[in-house]
Amino acid sequence: VRCPSCGARNRIPADRWGDERAVCGRCKSPMRPTVLFPERSVPISDSTFAGEVLAFEGPVLVEFFSPRCGHCIRLAPVLEELASEYAGRVKFVTLDIERNQAIASRENVNGTPTLFLYKRGKLVDRVVGALPKQELARHLDGIAA
């Protein structure tokens, strides 16, 4: 697992994953699950996509959105609720496709909202449209396990 402070790779055994005392071996920063998997969505860009998503070893939900999209605006609070509920297990990130067109184009994102679910840097699920919270939770349960 990469340290969010210095980027060093750390090994955390599965039985110690939730241990609040876990620290980075290099910089001694906390390696708590809520530090690695925050309770809120993290905005990313074309330049940070690889590091925040592809290099991240845990599950990640990427929301491709447009600030002018009505469905995206209605989905945002649902995703924030889910980010809080899945804190420590799934990392939530958002990518504004109007400002970051390279990744959206490369990933063939044709409409918004589009959600990609990654695990260990690999795309494992894709959801197009604003689904109900319970359905999104079902998709998240599949990658959080």
Model regions: which residues?
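Conserved residues in the N-terminal Rossmann fold of short-chain dehydrogenase/reductase
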Residues: 94
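Proteins that catalyze or organize thiol-disulfide redox chemistry
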Residues: 1-90, 99-102, 106, 114, ...
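Glycine-rich phosphate-binding loop
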Residues: 111
